[in-house]
Amino acid sequence: MASASASKRAESKAPGPKHNIEAMRQAYYERIAKHDMTPLWKVMKNVVTKEPVTRCAPVIWHYDDIKRLVMESGALITAEEAERRVLILENPGMRGESKATNTLFAGVQMILPGEVAPAHRHVSSAIRFVLDGEGAYTAVEGEKAYMSPGDFVITANWAPHDHGNTSNKPMLWLDVLDFPQVNFFETSFAEQFATATQPTSRADGDSLSFYASGVLPDGAPAALNRSPVINYTYARTRPIIERMLKAGDIDKRHGARVRYANPINGGPVLPTMGANLALFPKGFKGEKYRATDGTIFVCAEGQGATTIDGKALEWGPNDVFVVPPWKHYSHRAAKESVLFSISDRPAQEALGIWREDTGPH
């Protein structure tokens, strides 16, 4: 009897079939790991998700804080020393990665009177949206473009560019670059110039005069994958959205909105980034919307709030905020307001992966 009881106790302690298969699987995983392989079935739900998963967080940077802190940097480092005196607007969901969204960098650059940010070029495309100041310039591909608040300036892939401030006041603008996309593909290149400034042979507004007037310089390319216009001035764009508003051309989600376009083909200004400018009447309450492009917004005028998945971000002039991809959001305007926005939508559309949700919620 004692022998039979001992036998039963031993059987009860013996590993069952499930334990055996788990042990066999673990041993298998350890063996294949030595050959730099791993099973897809253990991670499938993480790499092929039912809906977008993002680390990007809703966040707002108020201009009072931005300006105060950027101005402080002027006493600490020169534009020449820094090459570009910029404070990165870092998304708290991706701390330490120099990203505002997963695919876009954003920062605020300041250039003081008399300073020059030296000429260079890089594979990453860049845009500037002017926040504060008057009379500083960006020189791009030989054209010196003087800037004013609300101007939208583009610097395409590998275009030589430098900045200077010939005014008597500081100039601040928002920089947005696509280098997270470029670095994902591991295709970053950059080049410094021997001189601080590039030779400029084209007058301010030269590219706009040619390419946005219905005529082209003889011999100019008939198709470009980026806009040849350097500066989309606020003075030209603001009246257009004003006319749309007066005509009642108001989207229930986006207000009276225009898209900055390549005048050659009507496409986006850059292959990796697209921008819009929207006017909202006082009292506007937008319907909910979401899309797969994480978007950076700037308040050019007015006052209001954007609610993102139930979280309200209250904004005013020159405040910058981020709406993460595939998060429901809606705008409301306490007074007539203008919002500039930029995202990676053109890149997603080129890959056939951009999606929006405009249905009732």
Predicted segments with their positions:
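A short beta-strand-loop-beta hairpin characteristic of the jelly-roll/cupin
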Residues: 112-149, 155-159, 289-317
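A short beta-loop-beta micro-motif enriched in histidine and acidic residues
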Residues: 94-105, 112-126, 142, 265-274, ...
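Contiguous mid-protein beta-loop-alpha structural module that forms a pocket-lining wall or clamp
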Residues: 153-211
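C-terminal functional regions that serve as terminal interaction/effector modules
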Residues: 8-62, 264-271, 275-278, 282, ...
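A short hydrophobic beta-strand segment most commonly corresponding to one strand
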Residues: 109, 127-129, 154, 168-187, ...
